[in-house]
């Protein structure tokens, strides 16, 4: 037997690799797991929370800094959480995790982030000094919190639409399963 025949199956290029329309890093990103309206909402959450964080970082002086610091923490956390959720939805990580757990995590993270971001924006409104950077951060904060809460409402509507489909079909099957086998 010749060496070429022994080693040829292991040295051939794997099918589907090489230069194509989706090679390299682009092959790892799949945007189709979310409907188009949810993709837009997730992108707006990411963008607006980043803009709120950047505008807040530009603020150089503050009178009552507690609201500013809380807003800073919340806007940065919202940005990182929305980035994490987008990474999970758009990469092969989504295939390795249970889809129900991803949806449930997204549901509760979006609700919590939206509520806390709204609270941080309200607190920042009551403690800001009136500079243009603070006002821009507040506007982006309210817009970002509204995108988070709108995404939560969309997920809630989808969840309520799915729930009647999952009701038990027949209780007679359950009764038949509990009967003894030797009867």
Swiss-Prot record:
Gene Ontology cellular component list: early endosome membrane; plasma membrane; recycling endosome membrane
Record localization: Cell membrane; Early endosome membrane; Recycling endosome membrane
Chief localization: membrane
Membrane topology (Cytoplasmic): 1-45, 89-106, 156-183
Top-level lineage group: Eukaryota
Transmembrane segments: 46-66, 68-88, 107-127, 135-155
Phosphoserine: residues bearing it: 8
GO biological process, one term: protein transport
UniProt modified residues of type N-acetylmethionine: 1
Domain MARVEL intervals: 33-160
Topology within the bilayer: Multi-pass membrane protein
Subunit structure: Interacts with PD-L1/CD274 (via transmembrane domain); the interaction is direct. Interacts with CMTM4. Interacts with CD58, ARG1, ENO1 and TMPO.
General function of this protein: Master regulator of recycling and plasma membrane expression of PD-L1/CD274, an immune inhibitory ligand critical for immune tolerance to self and antitumor immunity. Associates with both constitutive and IFNG-induced PD-L1/CD274 at recycling endosomes, where it protects PD-L1/CD274 from being targeted for lysosomal degradation, likely by preventing its ubiquitination. May stabilize PD-L1/CD274 expression on antigen presenting cells and potentiates inhibitory signaling by PDCD1/CD279, its receptor on T-cells, ultimately triggering T-cell anergy.
Similarity section: Belongs to the chemokine-like factor family.
Protein name as annotated: CKLF-like MARVEL transmembrane domain-containing protein 6
Species of provenance: Mus musculus (Mouse)
């Amino acid at each position: 037997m010749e060496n070429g025949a022994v080693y040829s199956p292991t040295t051939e290029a794997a099918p589907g690799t090489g230069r194509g329309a989706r090679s390299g890093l682009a092959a790892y990103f799949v945007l189709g797991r979310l409907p188009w309206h949810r993709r837009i909402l997730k992108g707006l959450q990411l963008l607006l929370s980043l803009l709120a964080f950047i505008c807040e970082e530009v603020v150089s002086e503050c009178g009552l800094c507690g609201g500013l610091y809380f807003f800073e923490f919340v806007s940065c956390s919202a940005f990182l959480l929305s980035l994490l959720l987008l990474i999970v939805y758009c990469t092969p990580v989504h295939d390795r995790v249970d889809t129900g757990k991803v949806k449930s995590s997204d549901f509760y993270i979006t609700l919590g982030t939206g509520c806390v971001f709204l609270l941080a924006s309200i607190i920042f409104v009551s403690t800001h000094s009136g500079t243009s950077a603070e006002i821009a951060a507040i506007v982006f904060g309210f817009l970002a919190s509204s995108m988070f809460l709108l995404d939560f409402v969309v997920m809630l509507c989808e969840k309520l639409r799915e729930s009647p489909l999952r009701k038990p079909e027949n209780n007679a099957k359950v009764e038949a399963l509990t009967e003894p086998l030797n009867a």
